């Protein structure tokens, strides 16, 4: 048997191929391809359930893994059924933070924060700092809050807004350093 325990992952998460060797003698050599490009054969030394973590991680999008043949330690060949597994890799979510209204503002005025979406699957949970205070909001695919419209801000002192992390609806997270 041949499957994957990770049919949908986030970019840079481990992708795994699962094999269940019911017959034959280890070690098992597996000739396979990724998206129709032949790869260096894998060697798995055990029998029964075996797992292989794909390195490097697959690219963003749908990746097809086809087993061409399995050769056991005695030279006996077979092709598993099914012989194909697919892994969907979701992109790392990315947004910017911009002031879309008046900047700078005077005391008593307000402005708008907007979060232009660059990649990922909406809605998003955005964590940010406002003058050192940790806050969060949910945004849609257009960069507005899911409650509608941009975020209205009216700080009473000069305030710096900094994105710290972003998580999309697929659970993919981007921890930001700036």
Question: What residue spans do the PLM features occupy?
Answer:
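Proline-enriched interdomain boundary motifs that mark the N-terminal boundary
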Residues: 1-5, 91-101
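Short, solvent-exposed loop/linker segments at the N-terminal edge
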Residues: 6-13, 103-109
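Short glycine/proline-centered coil/turn motifs in the loop regions
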Residues: 22-26, 118-121
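Short beta-strand elements bearing conserved aromatic residues within extracellular beta-rich modules
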Residues: 28-32, 124-128
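Solvent-exposed segments in extracellular or luminal domains encompassing
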Residues: 43-65, 138-162
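Beta-strand-rich extracellular modules
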Residues: 68-73, 164-169
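Terminal edge beta-strands and adjacent linker/stalk segments
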Residues: 75-92, 171-178
């Amino acid at each position: 048997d041949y499957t994957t325990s990770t049919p949908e992952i986030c970019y840079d998460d481990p992708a795994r191929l699962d094999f269940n060797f019911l017959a034959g003698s280890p070690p098992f050599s597996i000739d396979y391809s990724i998206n129709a490009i032949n790869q260096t054969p894998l060697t798995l030394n055990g029998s029964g359930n075996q797992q292989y973590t794909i390195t490097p991680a697959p690219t963003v999008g749908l990746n097809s893994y086809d087993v061409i043949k399995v050769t056991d330690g005695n030279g006996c060949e077979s092709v598993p059924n099914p012989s194909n597994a697919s892994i969907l890799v979701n992109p790392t979510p990315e947004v910017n933070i911009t002031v879309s209204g008046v900047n700078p503002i005077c005391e008593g005025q307000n402005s708008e924060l907007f979060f232009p979406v660059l990649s990922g699957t909406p809605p998003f949970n955005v964590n940010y700092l406002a003058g050192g205070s940790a806050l969060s909001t949910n945004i849609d695919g257009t960069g507005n809050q899911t409650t509608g419209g941009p975020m209205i801000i009216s700080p009473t002192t000069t305030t710096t807004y900094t994105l710290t992390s972003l998580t999309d609806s697929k659970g993919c997270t981007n921890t930001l350093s700036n």
